[in-house]
Amino acid sequence: MDQYTEKKWQEAWSKSKIFQPALDRNKKKFLITVPWPYTNGSLHVGHGRTYTLGDVIARYKRITGYNVLFPMGFHQSGTPILALASRLRNGEAKAISQLTRDIATYEPEQNIQKILKTMVEPKNIADYFSDATVKDFTSMGYSIDWSRRFTSADDFYQDFVRWQFLKLQRLGMIHQERYPILFSPAENNAVGEDDISDGDIDKVSIEEFNTITLI
């Protein structure tokens, strides 16, 4: 199918709000979610596979009579975006190259440096690639209800996560203990393997040493 025809039908779907389910008590309800993309760069072919599978299921359920809700969120929290902005502010060549390449996926060359300069602020990285992902998913023809778009950085979502932790703590299902963790002095924050360059390859481990005092 040529791009003109694709765009024609994508615009028709959007105008008719065909993927925004209305209340229908005569239909069974079906909610599908797919893990949200992390918004620190452009998408790759693996994303295409993941979200195409979700879309196939959503469409199949629609044609078999279900009232389907297929929303989409964006993962904007966590230290990788903060670290990327920090590396950009520090002028790290690898970070500059990575973002330049990713921006070039969506922008003409004359716009790249202007956009790159804004990305010293983490929120600008997250928001730019969230918007870019919407365009990618729309061009793929995914049957997502964009009226319910949200991010993990939204106030209501942060409040919901906080409520979950406090609720579980009050029920005695989670508790805080002292335990060795990965920690970044630069960010003054705990980090996971995904936050560390080659963290899944060059693993940090706890070493134990026994000392013997000779008298």
Identify the role of each PLM range.
Residues 1-215:
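N-terminal, positively charged nucleic-acid-binding surface of large information/translation enzymes
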